[in-house]
């Protein structure tokens, strides 16, 4: 075996993970130890001869995305029992899985890609798999059920382009938990090597713009926190909690939130 083999591939080859995607999720969640030392980067190589073990709880969802929605549900007053939901940017389906495990009656799993949704979810009668579908142009004809809840985890596009269509799909009082990704919200000149945004000042600007875009699209912003895990390249990301309602916005101390996120998720 080549000593250049990536850690995520090693986990799969050694039977420690069902698939490479699940291996990446377990590694990035901090559960993988090589020769007794935690390694949290899936692309780490040069470990072929070292003992590898997975410690602690295995990932409860088909991907680590479920951990992000799990935190949103613990932080904000979100309950999904018997709710009609949408997972925008479903990919493997971590958010969808989390919704189902929390009692969702039906989930529309929407992604512009194809063939990514985990088979467990694809074959679940509560899931409507909507592949090759650009959420920016979703219509009530495609999702005829008024949505109680939607999650958004999209890449290479700003949330402000998703909000208008989603507003028309949510019932009055419907809620959103969305992932705010600085690498796709900041201007190109503010994005560093490998697409990583490290500057706390830029993070604060991104959150301020998020608040503006949400309000311009008639959503009430009731909460913001940081994601419990970094993005694939190491980006700190944030979670927003929105509602289609006439309630007043919450009050947010963005500098403190950004400082806390950098302290808790430091390299």
Describe every region a protein language model picked out.
Residues 1-50, 84-85:
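A basic, amphipathic helix-loop patch mediating RNA/tRNA/ribosome contacts
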Residues 16, 74-81, 143-144:
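Glycine-rich helix-loop-beta junction characteristic of Rossmann-like nucleotide cofactor-binding loops
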Residues 81-91:
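Conserved class I S-adenosyl-L-methionine
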Residues 92-103:
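Conserved SAM-binding loop of SAM-dependent methyltransferases across substrates and taxa
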Residues 108-161:
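S-adenosyl-L-methionine
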Residues 160-177:
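A short glycine-rich, Lys/Arg-flanked "PGG" loop and its adjoining helix->strand segment in the class I
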Residues 182-199:
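Short, glycine-/aromatic-enriched active-site segment of Class I SAM-dependent methyltransferases
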Residues 236, 240-267:
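Flexible, glycine-/basic-rich loop-and-beta segments that form/coincide
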């Amino acid at each position: 075996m080549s000593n250049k083999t990536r850690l995520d591939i090693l986990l799969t080859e050694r039977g420690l993970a069902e698939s490479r995607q699940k291996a990446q999720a377990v590694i990035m969640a901090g559960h993988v130890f090589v020769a007794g030392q935690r390694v949290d980067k899936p692309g780490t190589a040069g470990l072929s001869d070292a003992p590898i073990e997975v410690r602690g709880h295995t990932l409860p969802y088909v991907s680590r995305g479920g951990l992000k929605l799990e935190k949103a549900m613990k932080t904000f007053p979100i309950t999904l029992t018997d709710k009609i939901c949408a997972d925008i940017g479903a990919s493997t389906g971590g958010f969808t899985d989390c919704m189902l495990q929390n009692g969702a009656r039906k989930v529309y799993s929407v992604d512009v890609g194809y063939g990514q949704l985990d088979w467990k979810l694809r074959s679940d009668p509560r899931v409507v798999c909507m592949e090759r579908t650009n959420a920016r142009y979703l219509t009530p004809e495609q999702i005829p059920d008024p949505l109680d809840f939607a999650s958004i985890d999209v890449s290479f596009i700003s949330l402000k382009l998703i909000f208008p269509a989603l507003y028309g799909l949510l019932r009055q009082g419907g809620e959103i938990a969305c992932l705010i990704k600085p690498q796709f919200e900041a201007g190109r000149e503010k994005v560093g090597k490998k697409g990583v945004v490290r500057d706390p000042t830029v993070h604060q600007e991104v959150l301020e713009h998020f608040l503006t875009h949400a309000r311009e699209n008639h959503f009430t912003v009731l909460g913001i926190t940081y994601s419990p895990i970094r993005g694939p390249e190491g980006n700190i990301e944030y979670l927003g909690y929105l509602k289609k309602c006439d309630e007043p916005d919450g009050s947010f101390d963005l500098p403190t939130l950004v400082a806390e996120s950098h302290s808790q998720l430091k390299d």
